[in-house]
């Protein structure tokens, strides 16, 4: 998924 803060792909790990 996308991180809703940075909007970077696959940052939400």
Swiss-Prot record:
- Annotated protein name in UniProt: Lymna-DF-amide 1
Q: Which residues carry this modification: Phenylalanine amide?
A: 13
- Main localization is secreted
Localization (cell): Secreted
Supply one GO BP term.
Answer: neuropeptide signaling pathway
- Entry keyword set: Amidation, Neuropeptide, Secreted
Gene Ontology terms: cellular component: extracellular region
């Amino acid at each position: 998924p996308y991180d809703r803060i940075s909007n970077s792909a696959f940052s939400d790990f």
